[in-house]
């Protein structure tokens, strides 16, 4: 590098205001001019190439040229001589010399495009296959003709390698090392970088990913100096760092999984269109399942100067008038042919064995059936067509029913506990888990390795618990898995002699661009609405490098919505295959699920679920289940194969709307749909009736019928007009003596004899005689005693009811016995003075209550919670007091409890906001959840924003435990330091002797604690007087 260039770089890095040298400026200007000239030359070559392909493109090019751009600068002055010549020449004929010069110019412009016959020398670590070399040559021809294209080979055919070979060709043959940008899904970032290093190490590839600080450092130290050829980054990074990427003149822009830009109004699509690029390449393994407008959006991104009007494109491909017409097919083929290359595995990769797919139909467990019934009954009015049918409501019902078919523990409160255990209940409460528990040991015994895909990450949580319980070595990847963990787990799974048996992935996050060909079994735990998602998941294993035949097991819960969802997805996939692979457009209306279809999917199997109460899970051997699944899969495949395109288009979900002939209402030549219309209750699903339980246990019946029961002892009579007194009303004890005397005398007058209580054993006779003696010796109340009784009846808390007493006890539990002010507020209908008076008597005489032990236990538990809240508040206060700006400075000592889900930034916010809102607030976790959603720092953090209040509470409890442990350690450390610093002779001899030989006095309990212990002790030794 020259001194001038060095000075320019240093000036840029130091952000100085000094001007760069004239040489650097002119060099930069030359590069800019060269880049602009190439774009203009490509445009010219592009038009020539397309017009030679077919005259169809004249339609678009003519339209794009209707509004020419206004020329810059002054108009060129026409010389008089030329003007006269133009006026005189009306025939516009060429001279022989002019024609010769034009032909010579065309010959010199025509050059032979380079083609590879074998794998290029710059490709290391292996040889490219013949179809991959053909793909490379096709992309080279696009480049030479200034055309951008779509590489749409089926998943697993090596699109990554073909793309790398194209960029290698540009460096080694065209002297264009870059800069190039490759934009890929986050899950495949590291895989792309690894592939660059493996196949073409001469290309210097760098990866832009990470948090703000990491990105800033990377941009300053790596990206801006430009010592690289290819920058690999993710969609999200393009959006966040768009201002940086706009500074570069990109030679090639490559987008993997290009369907992400099929909406031209999306943020990503708009930003990428602003990048300055010479060439663009789109990569997708998914067929073009686009409607007309989405197809235009892709073509507009590739060639904005050709396809610049969506309205013109829509008008030219008017599907309303010519869908299915041969003319439309011819047009579409002609338009797509120059830009699109798609090959299928069956056509080009003969060494890869075809995958074998099998559906395994499972039943519902008893718990699943119960939850399925609850969901249907909750919206039975909608299911029966009686309520307001809204699409969002139907979608929610479908989602809840799908959760039932996966596992009932996906519903909060379904799993038994606490305590929560990992046991057999994980298996026998779900039909799919029961099959999985039989299938996995068989696969492990066969030496297979397994990928399990599910749409629900919480289902992966359950599967993770199951793997822990069964001791299966596993990996897991979902949308929340950090980038570093993704790469590490993929490498661990793909290692030679890897101990990992299972890899659990979410269908959307784990189905894109990941190579897991070391596995040979794919289990689709729950099917996606979009069949292409499931195909992408299967192709993680079914790709180049796979040495075994890939087996795919799709788990389907029989006679539920899931069966219809899979059926619809298969019809959609087959129709797409007929249309798209034939080069035609998909009618977008067939992809939309209307309300009638959703309603009939929900209704499917509902009566069967209601009519049965028991489990459908069988104890059959796994081989028998697989054999039956294989037969049913073949039967359904044959039925679909027999349907033509017209039948597939009119395929219905057994709806009552206008449809074709393939509905199940067509039976034996009659349209039973018409008959059903005559019956107003034709679609009515009868909810299950409440049934009386009949006792059919014969042995138990006869044992009950023949048992000779002992007659119950007659109740002792009481005076008819005796007042009812309650123990919590705290009447004087003398009143109970007078009431007992009145009762005994009444029993004497009626001649009541006390029966022997056999339950008392040997003391029965003694107790009987004592009670009878009291009756025999009873005397009636005197006038003075009757007057005394009346006076005593007015001295108790007669206005206090059982409801008032329960409110008083709950208030003591909530606030503690010492907080009389708040206790008084919670007792409705009583003044503070009345509550204070009652409180004093209650704590003085509470031992007289019949269930004092239960009441005291209730109050003590509440006081324990209060003390716990105070200790937590104290711990949070201590932690926060150590920092001036805790929202930025606070650090947590995790030890071995870091966990993988929450980041330290999230934990810091939880702790600080919990302290700010107030830990002891009633709805603090709902407020915490709202604060997270309102915080700008989490606007892209979908994990923390999607947590429920209960999940936040659990996380905060964990963090509080860590803080308390940290506080204890700091206190112990401070005490130890103080002990070390204390001088040995600072304490007098007498006191030193006392402190060394005499134990420290025990701390005295609080008055309330002392009273509480006395109350319990007294209550345990006293018995309530029986009346």
Curated annotation (Swiss-Prot):
Domain SANT: 795-847, 898-962
Annotated Low complexity bias: 1-10, 984-999
Gene Ontology MF: a single term: DNA-binding transcription factor binding
GO process annotations (BP): chromatin organization; chromatin remodeling; DNA replication-dependent chromatin assembly; heterochromatin formation; negative regulation of DNA-templated transcription; nuclear speck organization; nucleosome organization; positive regulation of DNA-templated transcription
Annotated InterPro entries: Helicase_ATP-bd (IPR014001), Helicase_C-like (IPR001650), Homeodomain-like_sf (IPR009057), Isw1/2_DEXHc (IPR044754), ISWI_HAND-dom (IPR015194), ISWI_HAND-dom_sf (IPR036306), P-loop_NTPase (IPR027417), SANT/Myb (IPR001005)
Motif (DEAH box): 256-259
Principal place of residence: nucleus
Entries under PANTHER family matching the protein: CHROMODOMAIN-HELICASE-DNA-BINDING PROTEIN 3-RELATED-RELATED, SWI_SNF-RELATED MATRIX-ASSOCIATED ACTIN-DEPENDENT REGULATOR OF CHROMATIN SUBFAMILY A MEMBER 5
Known partners and oligomeric status: Component of the NURF complex composed of Caf1-55, E(bx), Nurf-38 and Iswi. Component of the chromatin accessibility complex (CHRAC), composed of Chrac-14, Chrac-16, Acf and Iswi. Interacts directly with Chrac-14 and this interaction is further stabilized by associated Chrac-16.
Name of the protein in question: Chromatin-remodeling complex ATPase chain Iswi
């Amino acid at each position: 590098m020259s001194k001038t260039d060095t000075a320019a770089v240093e000036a840029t890095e130091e952000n100085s205001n000094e001007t760069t040298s004239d040489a650097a400026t002119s060099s930069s200007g030359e590069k800019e001019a060269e880049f602009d000239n190439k774009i203009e030359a490509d445009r010219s070559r592009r038009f020539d190439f397309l017009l030679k392909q077919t005259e169809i493109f004249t339609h678009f090019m003519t339209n794009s040229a209707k509004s020419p751009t206004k020329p810059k600068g002054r108009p060129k002055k026409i010389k008089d001589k030329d003007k006269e010549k133009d006026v005189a020449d009306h025939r516009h004929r060429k001279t022989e010399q002019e024609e010769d010069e034009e032909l010579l110019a065309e010959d010199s412009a025509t050059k032979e495009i380079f083609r590879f016959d074998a794998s290029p020398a710059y490709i290391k670590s292996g040889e490219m296959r013949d179809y991959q070399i053909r793909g490379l040559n096709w992309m080279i021809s696009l480049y030479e003709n200034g055309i951008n294209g779509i590489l749409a080979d089926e998943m697993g055919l090596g699109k990554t390698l073909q793309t790398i070979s194209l960029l290698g060709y540009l460096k080694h043959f065209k002297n264009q090392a870059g800069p190039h940008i490759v934009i890929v899904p986050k899950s495949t970032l590291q895989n792309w970088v690894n592939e660059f290093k493996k196949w073409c190490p001469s290309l210097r590839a760098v990866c832009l990913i990470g948090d703000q600080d990491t990105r800033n450092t990377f941009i300053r130290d790596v990206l801006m100096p430009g010592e690289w050829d290819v920058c690999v980054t993710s969609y999200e990074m393009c959006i966040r760092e768009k201002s940086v990427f706009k500074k570069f003149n990109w030679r090639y822009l490559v987008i993997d999984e290009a369907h992400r830009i099929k909406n031209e109004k999306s943020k990503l699509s708009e930003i990428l269109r602003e990048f300055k690029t010479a060439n663009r390449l789109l990569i997708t393994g998914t067929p073009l399942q686009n409607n007309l407008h989405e197809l235009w959006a892709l073509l507009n991104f590739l060639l904005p100067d050709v396809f610049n009007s969506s309205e013109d494109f829509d008008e030219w491909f008017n599907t309303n008038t010519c869908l299915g017409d041969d003319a439309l097919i011819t047009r579409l083929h002609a338009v797509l042919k120059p830009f699109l290359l798609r090959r299928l595995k069956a056509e080009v990769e003969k060494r890869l064995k075809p995958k074998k797919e099998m559906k395994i139909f499972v039943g519902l467990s008893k718990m699943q059936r119960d939850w399925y019934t609850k969901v249907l009954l909750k919206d039975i009015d909608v299911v029966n067509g009686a309520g307001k049918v809204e699409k969002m409501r139907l979608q929610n019902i479908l989602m809840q029913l799908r959760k039932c078919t996966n596992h009932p523990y996906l519903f909060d409160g379904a799993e038994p506990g606490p305590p929560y255990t990992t046991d057999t209940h994980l298996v026998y409460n779900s039909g799919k888990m029961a099959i999985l528990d039989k299938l996995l040991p068989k696969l492990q015994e066969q030496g297979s390795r397994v990928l399990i895909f599910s749409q629900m990450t919480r289902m992966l949580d359950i599967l993770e618990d199951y793997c822990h319980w069964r001791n299966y070595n596993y990996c897991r990847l979902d949308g929340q898995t950090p980038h570093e963990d993704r790469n590490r787990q993929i490498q661990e799974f793909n290692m030679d002699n890897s101990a990992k048996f299972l890899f659990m992935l979410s269908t959307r996050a784990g189905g894109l661009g990941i190579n897991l060909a070391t596995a040979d079994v794919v289990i689709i735990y729950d099917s996606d609405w979009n069949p292409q998602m499931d195909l992408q998941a299967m192709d993680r294993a079914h790709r180049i490098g796979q040495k075994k035949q890939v087996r795919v097991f799709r788990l389907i819960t029989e006679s539920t919505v899931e069966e219809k969802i899979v059926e619809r997805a298969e019809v959609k996939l087959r129709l797409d295959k007929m249309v798209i692979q034939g080069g035609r457009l998909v009618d977008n209306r067939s992809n939309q699920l209307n309300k009638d279809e959703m309603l009939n999917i929900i209704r499917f199997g509902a009566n069967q679920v209601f009519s049965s109460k028991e489990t459908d899970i069988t104890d059959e051997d796994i081989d028998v289940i697989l054999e039956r699944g294989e037969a049913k899969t073949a039967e359904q495949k044959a039925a679909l194969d027999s349907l033509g395109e017209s039948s597939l288009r009119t395929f219905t979900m057994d709806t009552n709307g206008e449809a074709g002939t393939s509905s199940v209402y067509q039976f034996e030549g009659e349209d039973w749909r018409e008959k059903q219309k005559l019956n107003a209750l034709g679609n009515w699903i009868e909810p299950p009736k409440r049934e009386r339980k009949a006792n059919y246990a014969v042995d138990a019946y006869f044992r009950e019928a023949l048992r000779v029961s002992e007659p119950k002892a007659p109740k002792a009579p009481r005076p008819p007009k005796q007042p009812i007194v309650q123990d919590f009303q705290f009447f004087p004890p003398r009143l109970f003596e007078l009431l007992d005397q009145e009762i005994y005398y009444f029993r004497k007058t009626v001649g009541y004899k006390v029966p022997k209580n056999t339950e008392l054993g040997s003391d029965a006779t003694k107790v009987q005689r004592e009670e009878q003696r009291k009756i025999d010796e009873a005397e009636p109340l005197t006038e003075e005693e009757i007057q005394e009784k009346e006076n005593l009846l007015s001295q108790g808390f007669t206005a206090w009811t059982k409801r008032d007493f329960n409110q008083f006890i709950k208030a003591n539990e909530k606030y503690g016995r010492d907080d009389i002010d708040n206790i008084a507020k919670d007792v409705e209908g009583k003044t503070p003075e009345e509550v204070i008076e009652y409180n004093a008597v209650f704590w003085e005489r509470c031992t007289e209550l019949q269930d004092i032990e239960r009441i005291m236990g209730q109050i003590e538990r509440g006081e324990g919670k209060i003390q716990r809240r105070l200790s937590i508040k104290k711990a949070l206060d201590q932690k926060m007091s150590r920092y001036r700006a805790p929202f930025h400075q606070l650090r947590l000592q995790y030890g071995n409890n870091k966990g993988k889900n929450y980041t330290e930034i999230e934990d810091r916010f939880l702790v600080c906001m919990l302290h700010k809102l107030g830990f002891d607030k009633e709805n603090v976790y709902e407020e915490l959840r709202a604060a997270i959603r309102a915080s700008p720092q989490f606007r892209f953090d979908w994990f923390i924003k999607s947590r429920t209040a209960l999940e936040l509470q659990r996380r905060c409890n964990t963090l509080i435990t860590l803080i308390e442990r940290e506080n204890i350690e700091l206190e112990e450390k401070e005490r130890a330091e103080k002990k070390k610093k204390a001088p040995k002779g600072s304490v007098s001899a007498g006191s030193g002797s006392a402190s060394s030989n005499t134990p420290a006095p025990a701390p005295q309990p609080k008055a309330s604690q002392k009273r509480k212990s006395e109350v319990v002790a007294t209550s345990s030794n006293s018995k309530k007087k029986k009346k």
